[in-house]
A protein has these predicted regions:
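Helix-loop junctions and short alpha-helical segments
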Residues: 47-48, 55, 60-155
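Hydrophobic alpha-helical segments, especially transmembrane helices
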Residues: 42-43, 54, 173
Length: 227
């Protein structure tokens, strides 16, 4: 079992695998540069970035919806979500507005917050670099610095993961906005970026699952026990 966001990402990832297969079908797998196939590499970089962005948005929304549904009381909420409720209350001028969060009324406030996050998607998270991802998860579910979870002992520290992600997202921006980029895009770039994002998806989903478990005492998806 996995989150709905992960299932959607895995389905989208098949398109990337197909582009890599097309590259190999046309150019082979022997060492050496392939000319005339760079359009496949550029397309893959753009798609990987889009799928990474969509995954982050989806898992953040899924985590918030889980908290709204399963948190036992407002006391269990992360401080960042408590601040969100307090901010919305301050924006209301009616003196009785505070009573709307009594009992389970806070769930409605957070549901409204979820809808607002959905509306902000296109205009805010169109560059899914590490800072923007950190901001998204802090605002959506109260996780401080999501990118701090992106590390693999003996292989990569979180600072390096952030740097690599940001470089590839910048590359995607150059491709999308200028068409041609100063540096050519190779198949190695594609496979390296794809592997990085798959690793980031696993770490990000795991962090959200652990976070909502602490808040609600209920996992985002059930643990699969070996038979």
């Amino acid at each position: 079992m996995a989150s709905k966001a992960r299932a959607a990402f895995d389905k989208n990832a098949k398109d990337i695998k197909r582009l890599i297969e097309l590259h190999e079908d046309v150019g082979g797998t022997a060492p050496g540069r392939r000319y005339g196939l760079e359009v496949l590499n550029k397309s893959a970089i753009v798609l990987i970035t889009a799928f990474w962005e969509a995954y982050c948005e989806d898992i953040a929304a899924e985590g918030l919806a889980h908290i709204v549904k399963h948190a036992k009381s407002a006391d269990a909420l992360p401080n960042e979500l408590k601040k969100t409720i307090a901010k919305r209350l301050k924006q209301q001028q009616h003196e009785l507005e505070v009573w709307k969060i009594a009992d389970d009324g806070w769930r409605g406030y957070l549901s409204d917050h979820l809808e607002e996050l959905k509306k902000q998607r296109d205009r805010k998270l169109n560059t899914p670099k590490s800072d923007q991802i950190d901001e998204l998860f802090k605002a959506a579910v109260g996780i401080e610095k999501m990118s701090g979870n992106w590390y693999w002992p003996k292989r990569m520290k979180s600072d390096r993961a952030r740097e690599k992600l940001d470089d590839y997202v910048s590359l995607r921006g150059a491709i999308a906005h200028r068409g041609q980029h100063d540096t050519s895009v190779t198949k190695k770039n594609v496979t390296d970026y794809f592997e990085l994002v798959q690793d980031l998806v696993s770490k990000t989903g795991g962090a959200v699952n652990s976070h909502v478990l602490k808040v609600t005492n209920k996992r985002l998806w059930p643990r699969v026990r070996p038979k």
